[in-house]
C-alpha cells in the first residue's frame, strides 16, 4: 500500500513516488524526449489523431509506491506575453497577428492552434501577469512530470491530448474559477494536478493515456479556463477545487477505476453537475452554498449507499428524480439561496465521488466514467487490476458536450439582480394540446377574446384554455369537439350586438411535448423547443388580458383620469408590464416596464380647444389654418360617434381618414334626391349644430365619404396607435420614463401585484409557479482601456468618460484647411447678431489649434437666404475656391438639415458641419466647441484618439472591423424603402472608417447587396494598408433572434465570396448586436450623488445563467447612462472561424465602445455598429422630399455621393 504524503508549506500538494522500476523507465523516457520533439513530420500529420495505434505497455505494480514530494516551480515572476515553458525553462513566442499560438523547442513549431505531441520527460510552463495563450501540444507523455503555472491575468493555458502514464493529476481553481474540464482519455495509476488561481483563465489537458507519471498545472490569479481530459484512471487521485466565483468546472466522460475524485466549488458558482456514468464502490457528495436555487440528481443506479439532500434558507428547488439506489452514499446540500446542482443518471457502486460548491456555486461537472473498487482519502491512493494495453496515438478529441460553451473569466467579480423570475415547471403536465381557432367575421378583432370566452363557457363546458386572442388555443385536456353550436353573441360597451361564428379543430400535430422544456435544460439539445415555448408564453399572458390593453408582449394598465401623465398634442403616457418566457440555464419569466403614448380619451371639441387651437371655439373659429397640423393626428384614430337623442340609435366607433373639404355649413350630400348641407340635415332631425362652421370628420373610404360633425365625436379610450411619436412627445416620454433602477423595480413589482399571476386558474392548471423576486447572478466588471492621444500621452477612463486636459488629437491633418461659416440672413424676420457670429468663428479657430486642428484663420462668412437656390450658389463658389469645410448655422425654420446635406454631398461635394442657430446664440461655450471639433477632425480624415496597445489583443492591427445596420421606415410610411448602412475600418486602430449605403425593399432584414459592399470595403482597405485584412470582425446591428440563420447563410456567405474574389482568406467573427430587449441590471444599494440612477459600472458583463446555454452569448453595459436605467447590449456570436477566445472578444468589444469619434465617453455598443447606424441615418436623409419609390435602382442612382468627395473625406457622415 502507498504511504500517506505530507503536504509541503506554500500550498504544494502531495504526490506518491513511483516505484524503482517506474523511475528507471521514466529516466529512459526523459532521455528519449528531445529526439521525439525533433520530428517535424508529426506537425504535418494531424490525421494521426484520427488513426490511433495500439501498443503493449505494462503497468507498474502500484501497491509498492513510496512517498515523494512535489518540487516547486523554479521560475520566478512571469512573462508578459503568452508563450510556452518546457523542461524548467521559459520560452516566449506568440504570433503578433492574432489568434495564432506559436511554440518553438528544438525544431518543433506549432502554428494556428495545431497541437502536437510530447513524450516522457518534464514539461513546465508559467505564464505571467497579462498572459494570453499558453499551449502544450498533444503527444505521448510516459512517466514524466508536466507542470504549468499561469499568472495573474491568465488567458489560455492548454495541454492537448497525449499519453501520460503513472502520474499525478490534480486541479484546483481559485477565486474566480471559470472552466475546469477533464475530457476523455485513459489515465491509469497516476496523479494529475492543476491549480488555477484567483481569476483563472484557461487551462486544459486533453485526452490521453497517463500511466505512472506526474502532471501538474497551476494557474494564477486571473486565469479562467482549466481543463483536464477524461481518461481511464486506475489507482490514482483526481481532485478539482474551484474557488470563490466558480464558473464552470467539468470532468467529461471516461473510465476511472479505484481512485478518488473530488471537486469543490467556491463562493459564486451557480451550476454544479455530475453527468451519468458508472461509479463503483464509493461516496458521492455535493454541497451547494448560499445562493444556489436549483439542486437536482437525475435518475440512475446507485448501489450500496445513502442519498441525502438538504435545502437551506431560500432554497428554491431541490429535486432527485427516479433511479435505483443500492448501498453507496450520495449526499447534496443546498445553501441559503439555491442555485443549481445536478447529478445525472449513472451507476454508482462503491467508489467515492465528492463535490462541494460554495456560496454561489458556478458549474461543476463530472461526466460518466467507471470507478471500481476504490477507497482512499486526499493524498493517498491505491490501484488494483491487471495491466492494460495502451494505444500508441491519442484518441481524437470528443465533441464538446452540449451546453459547455466557454464563458469569460477576466474582470472584477460581483453580483447583480436581473429582472428575471424563476419558473417552477416541476408540476407541469407532460403534454398539452394545440387547437386552431377560426372566428368569422374577421372584423372587428377586438371582440375575439370576448366571443371566445363565451364559446368556452357555453360549448366547451368551461374547460380551462389558454387563448392567444387570434387563431390558437392550448389545453392540457382533450376538448370535446364533436357537438358544437358555433354561433355566439357579444355586446360591446355601447350596447351594440355582434354575432360571431367560432370553429375549433385540432392542428396537424396537436400534441405538444411540454417535457421538452425540461429535456432542453438537462440534455442541452441545441434546438429550442419552440412549440412548447409558444404554449407557455400564451399561458403566462392569461391573467393580463382582462385587466389591460395588450400591445405586443406588453400589457398597459389604464390610467386614472385624475392622475394621468400627459405628454403633448393630446397624448398620455401609460405604463405597462412587459413579460416574455425565456430559457437560460433554467426557465425564466423576463418582466419589465414599458411606456407607450396613447391618445387621451376626450370629446373632439375639447381636443381642439386644448391642443390644436389652444383657444375657445366660437362662431368665427375656422379649421383651415390648423388643418396641416390637425390631420396627421386624426388620420387613423378611432372616434366614438354619439348620435343625438332624436336619432334614437346607439353610438358607433369609426376610424377617421381626415377632415372634410368644407365646413358642415357648406359640405353637401345627396338626401332624398336633393343636395343638402350637413348642418341643415341635422337641423331637420331636430338637432341644430352648435358649431356648423367647423369641418366634419371623414370616416368613410376614398370611394364613399361618411362625414360626421366634430361636436358629436369623441376619441375612443385605450387606442394603441402604430405610429411614430413626434419630437416633443419623445422628449417628454424620455423624461417620464428615465427613473433609477430602484424606482423601476418598484413599478415592476406593483404591476406584478396587480396582475396576480400565481392566482390565475389557467397558469395553475398548467402546473406553473412563478417566483416573487428577481434572480441574482454573478457579474464581471472589465477594466477600461487607456486612451492614447498625440505624443504618446495617455488618459484614464473613469465611470465611462475621460478628459483630454490639454492633450491633442492623435493624428490631425497637417494641412491648413480653408473654412467658411454660412449663416441664414432671411429677407424678413430676426437676423443673426454679427458679433456672436464672429465670436463663434474665432472660438472654432483658437480651440482647433489647441487640439492640433489646423484651420485657416482667414474665415469666410457667407449669408444665405430662405431660397434654397442661394445655397447652390454658395456651395458652387466654395468648391471653386477649394474650401475644405463649410460650417452651416441652421435656423429653426426655413432651410432644413436634410436639404443642406443633399445639396452638399450629392450635388457639390462640399464637406459640411451643421450647428443650430440656437446653440450658437445661447450655448456657445468651450464644451460645445470641443464637441464640434471632435466631429470636424474626423470628417477631415484625422484620428481623435486610439486605445493603448494591449498585448492580449495583438490582432487589432491587421483586422477590419465592419458594422452594419438596416433602418426601416415607420409603420405609417409603407412606401418608403429600408436603408442599409455599412461602415468598415481601414486603419490599424479601428478609428477611421469608410461607408457604403444602399436602398432595398421595406422591412427586408438581411442585406441584399452585401457582396458588392464588401468588395468596395476590401478595395479601400487595400488602398490604405497595401494588404488585405487577416481578420474580419463583423458587428451586425438591427437583427431579431429569428433572423440569425439568414444573416449567417446569406450575409456571411457574401462576405466570404467577396474575400475569395480578391484572393484573401481572413478569419471571420460575426457578432450580432441586440439592443431591443428587456433585460436590465438592478444592483443593490441606493442612489448616490455620483450614481444618481443606481446603475452598474461600465464594463459589467453577464454571460452565465440567463444566456443561451448552447451559444456564445453575453450581456454588457459599456456606458454610464446619462439618465434612467442603463440598458445592457446583448451580443450573440454566430460565426467564429478564428476561434477568438471569449475573454478577448469581450475585452475587444468593450474597447471598441471607447472608439466612437463624436464624444469622449464610452457608448452603449461598439463604434463599428454605431457608425453603421449613422450611415443608414444619412441614407435616410437623402430620401427626404420623395414619397414614392417605384424603381429603387434608379432612385439610388439619383442619390450617388460625389465620388472624389467620398474618397477625400471617407468619414464625412460622422
From Swiss-Prot:
UniProt-annotated location(s): Nucleus; Cytoplasm, Cytoplasmic ribonucleoprotein granule
Keyword Metal-binding: yes
Swiss-Prot/TrEMBL cofactor(s): Mg(2+); Mn(2+)
Mutagenesis / variant outcome for changing residue 740 to P: In strain: 130
Residues at which a divalent metal cation binds: 965, 1037, 1173
Principal location listed in the UniProt entry: nucleus
Record note on what altering residue 866 to E does: In strain: 128, 130, 141, 186 and 187
Region listing for Disordered, in residue ranges: 1-412
Start-end of Gly residues biased regions: 118-131, 141-154, 164-177, 187-200, 210-223, 233-246, 256-269, 302-315, 325-338, 348-361
Domain of life: Eukaryota
Segments forming domain Piwi: 885-1186
Keywords associated with the record: Cytoplasm, Host-virus interaction, Magnesium, Manganese, Metal-binding, Nucleus, RNA-binding, RNA-mediated gene silencing
Effect of residue 835 to A: In strain: 128, 130, 138, 140, 141, 186, 187 and 196
Gene Ontology CC: one annotated term: nucleus
Pfam families in UniProt: ArgoL1 (PF08699), ArgoL2 (PF16488), ArgoMid (PF16487), ArgoN (PF16486), PAZ (PF02170), Piwi (PF02171)
Keyword Methyltransferase: no
Gene Ontology terms describing biological process: cellular response to virus; cellularization; defense response to virus; dosage compensation by hyperactivation of X chromosome; miRNA-mediated post-transcriptional gene silencing; negative regulation of viral genome replication; piRNA processing; piRNA-mediated gene silencing by mRNA destabilization
Record region (Interaction with guide RNA): 681-686, 1075-1076, 1119-1127, 1156-1178
InterPro entries: ArgoL1 (IPR014811), ArgoL2 (IPR032472), Argonaute_Mid_dom (IPR032473), Argonaute_N (IPR032474), PAZ_dom (IPR003100), PAZ_dom_sf (IPR036085), Piwi (IPR003165), Piwi_ago-like (IPR045246)
Molecular functions per Gene Ontology: endoribonuclease activity, cleaving siRNA-paired mRNA; metal ion binding; miRNA binding; RNA endonuclease activity; RNA endonuclease activity, producing 5'-phosphomonoesters; single-stranded RNA binding; siRNA binding
PANTHER family: EUKARYOTIC TRANSLATION INITIATION FACTOR 2C
Record text about domains: PAZ domain provides a major contribution for nucleic acid recognition. PAZ binds oligonucleotides of different lengths and has a strong preference for single-stranded nucleic acids (ssRNA or SSDNA) or RNA duplexes with single-stranded 3' overhangs. Can bind the characteristic two-base 3' overhangs of siRNAs, indicating that it may contribute to the specific and productive incorporation of siRNAs and miRNAs into the RNAi pathway.
Subunit structure, interactors included: Interacts with Fmr1, Dcr-1 and vig to form the RNA-induced silencing complex (RISC), a ribonucleoprotein (RNP) complex involved in translation regulation, other components of the complex are RpL5, RpL11 and Rm62. As part of the RISC complex, interacts with Tudor-SN. Interacts with Taf11.
Family: Belongs to the argonaute family. Ago subfamily.
Protein name: Protein argonaute-2
Organism: Drosophila melanogaster
Amino acid at each position: 500500500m502507498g504511504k500517506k504524503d505530507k503536504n509541503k508549506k506554500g500550498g504544494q500538494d502531495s504526490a506518491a513516488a513511483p516505484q524503482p522500476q517506474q523511475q528507471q523507465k521514466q529516466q529512459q523516457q526523459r532521455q528519449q524526449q528531445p529526439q521525439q520533439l525533433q520530428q517535424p513530420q508529426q506537425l504535418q500529420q494531424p490525421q494521426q489523431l484520427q488513426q490511433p495505434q495500439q501498443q503493449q505497455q505494462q503497468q507498474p505494480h502500484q501497491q509498492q509506491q513510496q512517498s515523494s514530494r512535489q518540487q516547486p516551480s523554479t521560475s520566478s515572476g512571469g512573462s508578459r506575453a503568452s508563450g510556452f515553458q518546457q523542461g524548467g525553462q521559459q520560452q516566449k513566442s506568440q504570433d503578433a497577428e492574432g489568434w495564432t499560438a506559436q511554440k518553438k523547442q528544438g525544431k518543433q513549431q506549432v502554428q494556428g492552434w495545431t497541437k502536437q505531441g510530447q513524450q516522457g520527460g518534464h514539461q513546465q510552463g508559467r505564464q505571467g501577469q497579462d498572459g494570453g495563450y499558453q499551449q502544450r501540444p498533444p503527444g505521448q507523455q510516459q512517466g514524466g512530470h508536466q507542470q504549468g503555472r499561469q499568472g495573474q491575468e491568465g488567458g489560455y493555458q492548454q495541454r492537448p491530448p497525449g499519453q501520460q502514464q503513472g502520474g499525478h493529476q490534480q486541479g484546483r481553481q481559485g477565486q474566480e474559477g471559470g472552466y475546469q474540464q477533464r475530457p476523455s482519455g485513459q489515465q491509469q495509476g497516476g496523479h494529475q494536478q492543476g491549480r488555477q488561481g484567483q481569476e483563472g483563465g484557461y487551462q486544459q489537458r486533453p485526452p490521453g493515456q497517463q500511466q505512472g507519471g506526474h502532471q501538474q498545472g497551476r494557474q494564477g490569479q486571473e486565469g479562467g479556463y482549466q481543463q483536464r481530459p477524461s481518461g481511464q484512471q486506475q489507482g490514482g487521485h483526481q481532485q478539482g477545487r474551484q474557488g470563490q466565483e466558480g464558473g464552470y468546472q467539468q470532468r467529461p466522460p471516461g473510465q476511472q477505476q479505484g481512485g478518488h475524485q473530488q471537486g469543490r466549488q467556491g463562493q459564486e458558482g451557480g451550476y454544479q453537475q455530475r453527468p451519468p456514468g458508472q461509479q463503483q464502490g464509493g461516496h458521492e457528495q455535493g454541497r451547494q452554498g448560499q445562493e444556489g436555487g436549483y439542486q437536482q440528481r437525475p435518475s440512475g443506479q446507485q448501489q450500496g449507499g445513502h442519498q441525502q439532500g438538504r435545502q437551506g434558507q431560500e432554497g428554491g428547488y431541490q429535486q432527485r428524480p427516479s433511479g435505483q439506489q443500492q448501498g453507496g452514499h450520495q449526499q447534496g446540500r443546498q445553501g441559503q439561496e439555491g442555485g443549481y446542482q445536478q447529478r445525472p443518471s449513472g451507476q454508482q457502486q462503491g467508489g467515492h465521488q465528492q463535490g462541494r460548491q460554495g456560496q454561489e456555486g458556478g458549474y461543476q461537472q463530472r461526466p460518466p466514467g467507471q470507478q471500481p473498487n476504490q477507497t482512499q482519502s486526499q493524498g493517498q491512493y491505491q490501484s488494483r487490476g491487471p495491466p492494460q494495453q495502451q494505444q500508441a496515438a491519442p484518441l481524437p478529441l470528443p465533441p464538446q458536450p452540449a451546453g459547455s460553451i466557454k464563458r469569460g473569466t477576466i474582470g472584477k467579480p460581483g453580483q447583480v439582480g436581473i429582472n428575471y423570475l424563476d419558473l417552477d415547471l416541476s408540476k407541469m403536465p407532460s403534454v398539452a394540446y394545440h387547437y386552431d381557432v377560426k372566428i368569422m367575421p374577421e372584423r372587428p378583432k377586438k371582440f375575439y377574446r370576448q366571443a371566445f370566452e363565451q364559446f368556452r363557457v357555453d360549448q366547451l363546458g368551461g374547460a380551462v384554455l389558454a387563448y392567444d386572442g387570434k387563431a390558437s388555443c392550448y389545453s392540457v385536456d382533450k376538448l370535446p369537439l364533436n357537438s358544437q353550436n358555433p354561433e355566439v353573441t357579444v355586446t360591446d360597451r355601447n350596447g351594440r350586438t355582434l354575432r360571431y361564428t367560432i370553429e375549433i379543430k385540432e392542428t396537424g400535430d396537436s400534441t405538444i411535448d411540454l417535457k421538452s422544456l425540461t429535456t432542453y435544460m438537462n440534455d442541452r439539445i441545441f434546438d429550442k423547443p419552440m412549440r412548447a415555448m409558444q404554449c407557455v408564453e400564451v399561458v403566462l399572458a392569461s391573467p393580463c388580458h382582462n385587466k389591460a390593453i395588450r400591445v405586443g408582449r406588453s400589457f398597459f394598465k389604464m390610467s386614472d383620469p385624475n392622475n394621468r401623465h400627459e405628454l403633448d398634442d393630446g397624448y398620455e403616457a401609460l405604463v405597462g408590464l412587459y413579460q416574455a418566457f425565456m430559457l437560460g440555464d433554467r426557465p425564466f419569466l423576463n418582466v419589465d416596464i414599458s411606456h407607450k403614448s396613447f391618445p387621451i380619451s376626450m370629446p373632439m371639441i375639447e381636443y381642439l380647444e386644448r391642443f390644436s387651437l389652444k383657444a375657445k371655439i366660437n362662431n368665427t373659429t375656422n379649421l383651415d389654418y390648423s388643418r396641416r397640423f390637425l390631420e396627421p393626428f386624426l388620420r387613423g384614430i378611432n372616434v366614438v360617434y354619439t348620435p343625438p337623442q332624436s336619432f334614437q340609435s346607439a353610438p358607433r366607433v369609426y376610424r377617421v381618414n381626415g377632415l372634410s373639404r368644407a365646413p358642415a355649413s357648406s359640405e353637401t350630400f345627396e338626401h332624398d334626391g336633393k343636395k343638402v348641407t350637413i348642418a341643415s340635415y341635422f337641423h331637420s332631425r331636430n338637432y341644430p349644430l352648435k358649431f356648423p362652421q367647423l369641418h366634419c370628420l371623414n370616416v368613410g373610404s376614398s370611394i364613399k365619404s361618411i362625414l360626421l360633425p366634430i361636436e358629436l365625436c369623441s376619441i375612443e379610450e385605450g387606442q394603441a396607435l402604430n405610429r411614430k411619436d413626434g419630437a416633443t412627445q419623445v422628449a417628454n416620454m424620455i423624461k417620464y420614463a428615465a427613473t433609477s433602477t430602484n424606482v423601476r423595480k418598484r413599478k415592476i413589482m406593483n404591476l406584478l401585484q396587480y396582475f396576480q399571476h400565481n392566482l390565475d386558474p389557467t397558469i395553475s392548471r398548467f402546473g406553473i409557479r412563478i417566483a416573487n423576486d428577481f434572480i441574482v447572478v454573478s457579474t464581471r466588471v472589465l477594466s477600461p482601456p487607456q486612451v492614447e492621444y498625440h505624443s504618446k500621452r495617455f488618459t484614464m477612463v473613469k465611470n465611462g468618460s475621460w478628459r483630454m486636459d490639454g492633450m491633442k488629437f492623435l493624428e490631425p491633418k497637417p494641412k491648413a484647411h480653408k473654412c467658411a461659416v454660412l449663416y441664414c440672413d432671411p429677407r424678413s424676420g430676426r437676423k443673426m447678431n454679427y458679433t456672436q457670429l464672429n465670436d463663434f468663428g474665432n472660438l472654432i479657430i483658437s480651440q482647433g489649434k489647441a487640439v492640433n486642428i489646423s484651420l485657416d484663420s482667414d474665415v469666410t462668412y457667407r449669408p444665405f437666404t430662405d431660397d434654397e437656390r442661394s445655397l447652390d450658389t454658395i456651395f458652387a463658389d466654395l468648391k471653386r475656391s477649394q474650401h475644405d469645410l463649410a460650417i452651416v448655422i441652421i435656423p429653426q425654420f426655413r432651410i432644413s438639415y436634410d436639404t443642406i446635406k443633399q445639396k452638399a454631398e450629392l450635388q457639390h461635394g462640399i464637406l459640411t458641419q451643421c450647428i443650430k442657430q440656437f446653440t450658437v446664440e445661447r450655448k456657445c461655450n468651450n464644451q460645445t466647441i470641443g464637441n464640434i471639433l471632435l466631429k470636424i477632425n474626423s470628417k477631415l480624415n484625422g484620428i481623435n484618439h486610439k486605445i493603448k496597445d494591449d498585448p492580449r489583443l495583438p490582432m487589432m492591427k491587421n483586422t477590419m472591423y465592419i458594422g452594419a445596420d438596416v433602418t426601416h421606415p415607420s409603420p405609417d410610411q409603407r412606401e418608403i424603402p429600408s436603408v442599409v448602412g455599412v461602415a468598415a475600418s481601414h486603419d490599424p486602430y479601428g478609428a477611421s472608417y469608410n461607408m457604403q449605403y444602399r436602398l432595398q425593399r421595406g422591412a427586408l432584414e438581411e442585406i441584399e447587396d452585401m457582396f458588392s459592399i464588401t468588395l468596395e470595403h476590401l478595395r479601400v482597405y487595400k488602398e490604405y494598408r497595401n494588404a488585405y485584412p487577416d481578420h474580419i470582425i463583423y458587428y451586425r446591428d438591427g437583427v431579431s433572434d429569428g433572423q440569425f440563420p439568414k444573416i449567417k447563410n446569406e450575409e456571411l456567405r457574401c462576405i466570404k465570396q467577396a474575400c475569395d474574389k480578391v484572393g484573401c482568406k481572413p478569419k471571420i467573427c460575426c457578432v450580432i448586436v441586440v439592443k431591443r430587449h428587456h433585460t436590465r441590471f438592478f444592483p443593490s444599494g441606493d442612489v448616490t450623488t455620483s450614481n444618481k440612477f443606481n446603475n452598474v459600472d461600465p464594463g459589467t458583463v453577464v454571460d452565465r445563467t440567463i444566456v443561451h446555454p448552447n451559444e456564445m452569448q453575453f450581456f454588457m453595459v459599456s456606458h454610464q447612462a446619462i439618465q434612467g436605467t442603463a440598458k445592457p447590449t446583448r451580443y450573440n456570436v454566430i460565426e467564429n472561424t478564428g476561434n477568438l477566445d471569449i475573454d478577448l472578444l469581450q475585452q475587444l468589444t468593450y474597447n471598441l465602445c471607447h472608439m466612437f469619434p463624436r464624444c469622449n465617453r464610452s457608448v452603449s455598443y461598439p463604434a463599428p455598429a454605431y457608425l453603421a447606424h449613422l450611415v443608414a441615418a444619412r441614407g435616410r436623409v437623402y430620401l427626404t422630399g420623395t414619397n414614392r419609390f417605384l424603381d429603387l435602382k434608379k432612385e439610388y442612382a439619383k442619390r450617388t455621393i460625389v465620388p472624389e468627395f467620398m474618397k477625400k473625406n471617407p468619414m464625412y457622415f460622422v
